[in-house]
Amino acid sequence: MTTEAKCPFNHAVVGTGTTNRDWWPKQLRVDLLSQHSSKSNPLGQSFNYADAFKRLDLQALKRDLHALMTDSQDWWPADFGHYGPLFVRMAWHSAGTYRIGDGRGGGGRGQQRFAPLNSWPDNVSLDKARRLLWPIKQKYGQAISWADLMILTGNVALESMGLKTFGFAGGREDTWEPDQDLYWGRETKWLGGDDRYSRGSPGVDEAHGVLVKDDDSQVPHTRDLENPLAAVQMGLIYVNPEGPDGNPDPIASARDIRDTFARMAMNDEETVALIAGGHTFGKTHGAGPADNVGAEPEAGELESQGLGWHNRYGSGKGADTITSGLEVTWTTTPAQWSNDYFDHLFGFEWELSKSPAGAHQWVAKNADAIIPDAHDASRKHRPTMLTTDLALRFDPAYEAISRRFQQHPEQFADAFARAWFKLTHRDMGPRSRYLGADVPAEELVWQDPVPAVDHPLVDAQDAAALKQTILASGLSVAHLVSTAWASATTFRGSDKRGGANGARIRLAPQKDWQANQPEQLAKVLATLERIQADFNAAQSGGKKISLADLIVLAGNAAVEHAAQAAGHQVTVPFAPGRTDASQQQTDVESFAVLEPVADGFRNFAKRRYAVPAEALLIDKAQLLTLTAPELTVLVGGLRVLGANVGDSKHGVFTSRPGVLSNDFFANLLDMRTEWKATSEAKDEYEGRDRSTGELRWTGTRVDLVFGSNSILRAVAEVYASADAQEKFVHDFVAAWTKVMQLDRFDLA
């Protein structure tokens, strides 16, 4: 027997082999609810990043970053002697993965360090940017996260190149493993777009390539991008700089730009400011054919130490660098803020050309060589632009904004500074999460502001009295629970938006959402507002309760009442301090994306979707930062409390609705019931007595999944057990309280 044959680890290495998802590709991703546990965090559960950041000498750190900008390293020389443009790109590409549709992506978790982002074709050479930063990160240690450092470095880069920035806020905590919940698309090749569009690019086989015109893409002006994606091709941040699928069509490119930037919550003015401002600096890199570039970081050898895209062309760096395959420098001041970009955009006529790598780009007709070389002071080049740049000239709306910025440089500088701040802070949530001395004082509507507390808060005695008044008001347990749930569960852990604070459930657009049952909601709110007014009028010393607090307190009262009906005395924790936002503080268009298209917790779906209802339930639970046990206990409790939209009886597996019992689980797992779908769509089911055929219950996919999915069933069996009633009540109260307080960052 050979030595190789004797080795017990010839193939059987831990984690390899055929997986469950290989066997069952459509298996429900319950594992998404257990991401980023304390087991992956080397800092331990006791580490408090906010406290660590407060001890940071921010000004000293910024001085070190300023020095780094012009400290060119031989192993990766700085273009134009300044790393600023590289670091602006790093920060932009960290924040720029954010999409407003589900709030996921963005720079708030430091995910650019991990796959797939660290190996995206659009992120070529950003591995070098992070390595340039490593000595500074090493020096300041855990006082600043990678997530904060990448954004701060982009800010300092802009300042070092002459722009007055709007401000900077820290508070982004690092994660320690790749996000698994982000849907980047289903394409299996880099730069592919053939799934997100009905007819898009098939992509390339290599991790780095230049995509030229794709004749299969017939309708770039009218195509619709799949939601919630905000990038036109797999591995790009936004758009293809050559044009849609490599078609060098500025007007079609403008459509892609408008669509993708809107999905990152940017309007036309912000879009123009960001593109023009970003392209005021630096250059793109396409010194030679793309086939000179090697594997991305995740496919690299051990000796590469996490660096990728080894370039065999010339020196492989400096003047020989290849990233996008494009070779464009926009301005005569690539390391200094200026208005050159617009002067060149409108001052020249442009003709189509190709980079040394074969990518479509544009060169100024009959122009002198006025653009400096990045590494040879004796050389000059003709002005060049990307197809996406020309979109700002030939799209009528973009052109009007661009010409105004050209004529009013001060407006351009201010618009870019503000848009950059929004780009890099959009996923951080409310201002209460902002840390540091550079936080701007101005309140912005996209931050979803709420008023500060300016009055004494209610105490425990007040809360107890209010709960009695609420329960005597004639409002049902179901109405109180569903209203509190609807108010709190707009929250998204992805971008920290939504939640009960602000009581925006009484404002447009939330008051009119189908899931919120507008007619019922109006009656509940009217009653609660009367209770609020009576209480506040009776107080002395300015004590008040906000409607936001009262909505949550009312839900708590209903839960306590239902638990008492089940034989359990509980007090649901309540922390006053929420305030009521105004309609003027609420951007209707921005809040519209928070509308639930489906909420399995309330057995609601706005319509039938291609995605199974149980998968949408997992998505909702993940955005609410729930674990699998929390998801399970909440669904079971909400069903018996009657919180379904439209008073639907689906999933109400109890003969005593309004009582906080574990009946949902006991009856779902009862083998005396046989379940059958009521239609070929298999979205609703009947449960009949196996012996008599008598109808016992009706349910939906999000009900039956707790008996069907092996992981969720394992949890459901705990709560269905004969000894589980008390545990069920206490676990429900804990999970309910967590949801009610998801947006209470002031309590952390």
Swiss-Prot record:
Homodimer or homotetramer. Bifunctional enzyme with both catalase and broad-spectrum peroxidase activity. Keywords: Heme, Hydrogen peroxide, Iron, Metal-binding, Oxidoreductase, Peroxidase. Its cofactor is heme b. GO terms for biological process: cellular response to hydrogen peroxide; hydrogen peroxide catabolic process. Binds 1 heme b (iron(II)-protoporphyrin IX) group per dimer. Its EC number is 1.11.1.21. GO terms for molecular function: catalase activity; heme binding; metal ion binding. There is a cross-link at Y238-M264 (Tryptophyl-tyrosyl-methioninium (Tyr-Met) (with W-92)). There is a cross-link at W92-Y238 (Tryptophyl-tyrosyl-methioninium (Trp-Tyr) (with M-264)). The record marks R89 as: Transition state stabilizer. This is Catalase-peroxidase. Belongs to the peroxidase family. Peroxidase/catalase subfamily. Formation of the three residue Trp-Tyr-Met cross-link is important for the catalase, but not the peroxidase activity of the enzyme. Heme b binds at H279. InterPro entries: Catalase_peroxidase, Haem_peroxidase, Haem_peroxidase_sf, Peroxidases_AS, Peroxidases_heam-ligand_BS. It comes from the Bacteria. It catalyses: H2O2 + AH2 = A + 2 H2O; 2 H2O2 = O2 + 2 H2O. PROSITE patterns: PEROXIDASE_1, PEROXIDASE_2, PEROXIDASE_4. Signal peptide: none annotated. GO terms for cellular component: cytosol. The active site is at H93 (proton acceptor). PANTHER family: CATALASE-PEROXIDASE, HYDROPEROXIDASE I, BIFUNCTIONAL CATALASE-PEROXIDASE.
